């Protein structure tokens, strides 16, 4: 469905998942994703064009549907001919007909069986079942209990994410393909600050924290998972 050599998807991460990282992952045989989070529409457009200069392999764009310019980005990726989209923080239903007309593969990120079923009914081609071990805004279920329940409930492919950092993690949840995010933060190909890359590389198993509650339209409150910093 995705046209990739290896079952590895690089998740969309704000400030990290740029054209350079997406192209590097795609050139290596996985699926690279450009993040549109906290980015202007033209900036995302430029990253798409840059990625096409860096790779002739499949790549996609991640859209945060709660963003003020989500509608503009939804229209832009349609016009630009992006082939693969992942979505989060909202329902892509209002854009689905337009994207389907263009043959775009739409893969929402979900944190529950109920949301996964809604996305399937809306016409999603697959879903990313992302457990609470993931970074960023997370749900309540952890990856191990979440993924099997979503697999059993859906008729479309399910991609596992959350706490997976290598093939052993993917084998544990028995998912092919699987999505990685934080694993790519320390790589030199993207433009994130060097201090962040180095700190991520040094982190152990007790440096990730859950804090705060954020309001989303499809979920009243969502926790946020992040690295601990000395300030």
Regions found by a protein language model. Give the residues of each.
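Active-site entrance/lid segments in N-terminal catalytic domains of soluble metabolic enzymes
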Residues: 1-157
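Conserved active-site-proximal phosphate/metal-binding subdomains
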Residues: 145-155, 159, 165-231
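Residue-level detector of alpha-helix initiation sites
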Residues: 16, 164-165
């Amino acid at each position: 469905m995705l046209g990739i050599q290896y079952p590895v998807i690089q998740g969309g991460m704000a400030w990290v998942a740029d054209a350079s990282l997406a192209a590097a992952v795609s050139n290596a045989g996985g699926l690279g994703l450009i993040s549109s989070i906290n980015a202007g529409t033209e900036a995302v457009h430029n990253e798409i064009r840059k990625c096409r200069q860096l790779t002739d392999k499949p790549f996609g764009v991640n859209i945060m549907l709660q963003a003020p310019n989500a509608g503009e980005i939804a229209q832009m990726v349609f016009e630009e001919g992006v082939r693969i989209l992942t979505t989060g923080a909202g329902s892509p239903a209002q854009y689905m007909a337009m994207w389907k007309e263009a043959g775009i593969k739409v893969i929402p990120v979900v944190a529950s069986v109920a949301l996964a079923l809604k996305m399937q009914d809306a016409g999603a081609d697959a879903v990313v079942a992302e457990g609470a071990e993931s970074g960023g805004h997370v749900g309540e279920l952890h990856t191990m209990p979440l993924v099997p329940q979503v697999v059993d409930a859906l008729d479309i492919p399910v991609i596992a994410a959350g706490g997976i950092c290598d093939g052993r993690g993917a084998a544990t949840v028995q998912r092919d393909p699987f999505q990685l995010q934080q694993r790519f933060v320390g790589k030199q190909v993207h433009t994130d600050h060097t201090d962040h890359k180095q700190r991520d590389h040094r982190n152990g198993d007790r440096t990730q924290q859950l804090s705060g509650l954020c309001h989303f339209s499809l979920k009243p409150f969502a926790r946020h998972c992040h690295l601990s910093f000395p300030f």
